[in-house]
Each structure stands twice: as C-alpha cells, then as structure tokens.
Amino acid sequence: MNLRLLTLALAAVAAASPVDIQERQLSGGNELRDGSCKPITFIFARASTEPGLLGISTGPAVCNGLKMAKAGQVACQGVGPKYTADLASNALPENTSPAAIQEAQDLFQQAVTKCPDTQIVAGGYSQGTAVMDDSIKRLPDNVKEKIKGVVLFGYTRNAQEHGQIANFPKDKVKVYCAVGDMVCDGTLIVGPAHFTYLGNTGEATQFLLGYLRFLQLTQLP
C-alpha cells in the first residue's frame, strides 16, 4: 500500500467535496449522545482525514436529506472521537482501528438502550465503511434487528466481504462503488473516482427512507 498516495488523495477531500455551511449547521453530529430521542437515528462514520464527527461530504448530505424528508424525527450521530479517521488505520487487518470498531458498536448499543423505540439507519465513507462493516457484523441480533438500512460509499472492504456486511441481511445494504475506484477492488489505492460519492447521496437517502417509509414513526419524548 502507498500511504503517501493515500495521504495526498484524502487530504483533498475537503476541497473536492464542499458542503454548504447551512447544511453543516443542520447536520449536528452528536445528537444521539447529547440530544433527545428521535424516531430515526442515523449513525455515520466519516472518511479518513475528514474533520468533525460526520465529516464534510457524504455524511452531512445524507443526514440533511433524512432531516428534510422527516422533519423533527431524525438524530444524526457521527462515530468519534475514538475513531480518529487517521490514515494509518486503513492498513490494519480490519482496515480501521479496534477503538473505532468498539466505539461504533457502543453507539449502536446506546441507540437501542437510550431510545428503544428508535429505528436505526447507518452509513460510512471510505475508512468509515470498514468501521460500519466491522462493528455491525459483531452486534447482537437484537441490535441488528433495529438497523433498517446501511449505505456504504467507496467500500474499502467490498472485495473481502463480497459486497455485503457479514452476518447482516444483504438487502438492507447499499454499496456505492464508482467505476475506477480501486479501494472497492481490495486495494488502498485512492484515485479521483473515490471522491465522486456526493452524487450518490440523494439516491442513498431514498434507499434508507424506503426502509423507513412503512414504519409507524411518532415523536419520542
């Protein structure tokens, strides 16, 4: 793996994928931990080098899409701060750190414990897809059952996991792998195609909403 190439490419993500300031303000990012329970909880793991908890590209875009469709009913929670989105963790055996995996598991568990009536949707971008894969497949069945859909952008474990998340229903997972994005082929070589996923966030939002559409959603106390 060429960590220098990965560093240079991912360092450009903020410039390549700007998000409107108002959208960033809407996105929050720590609303499960700090806010009240909502009928829908969105848990997201950002790409390497992205700042904040949700990042500044696909995470806020999907969060805001859900909030616009389900006004007042969505809490958005990013994985962090133990998940640091550092570059070196991409080279670990599970393509992210044990601390990141455990933190994501804890957030899913917290959503179920704190807000037992909430429905969970989730997502990840780049290294964040590994965080989602490695955490969700380890969750107990009662927590997995609360996760209604997962969207993965530039899935770094796509080849290893055969386009799915192990021990989780394949039909609940939507993988976005752009033509030419070599991270989806089991490498960590990052090229321009890896930075095109903002264009998929509208479809990804609709995918998640499709699993929520027929649920009885009421405002939680």
UniProtKB/Swiss-Prot annotation:
Site (Transition state stabilizer): 48, 127
Gene Ontology BP terms: carbohydrate catabolic process
EC number(s) reported in the record: 3.1.1.74
Signal peptide boundaries: 1-16
GO cellular component: extracellular region
Presence of the UniProt keyword Disulfide bond in the record: yes
Disulphide-bridged cysteine pairs: 37-115, 63-76, 177-184
An MF annotation (GO) of this entry: cutinase activity
Cross-referenced PROSITE patterns: CUTINASE_1 (PS00155), CUTINASE_2 (PS00931)
The keyword Transcription regulation appears for this protein: no
Reaction equations catalysed: cutin + H2O = cutin monomers
Keywords: Disulfide bond, Hydrolase, Secreted, Serine esterase, Signal
Active site: 126 (nucleophile), 181, 194 (proton donor/acceptor)
Main location: secreted
Subcellular location: Secreted
Family: Belongs to the cutinase family.
Role: Catalyzes the hydrolysis of complex carboxylic polyesters found in the cell wall of plants. Degrades cutin, a macromolecule that forms the structure of the plant cuticle.
PANTHER family in alphabetical order: CUTINASE 1-RELATED, CUTINASE 2-RELATED
Protein name: Probable cutinase 2
Species the sequence originates in: Aspergillus oryzae (strain ATCC 42149 / RIB 40) (Yellow koji mold)
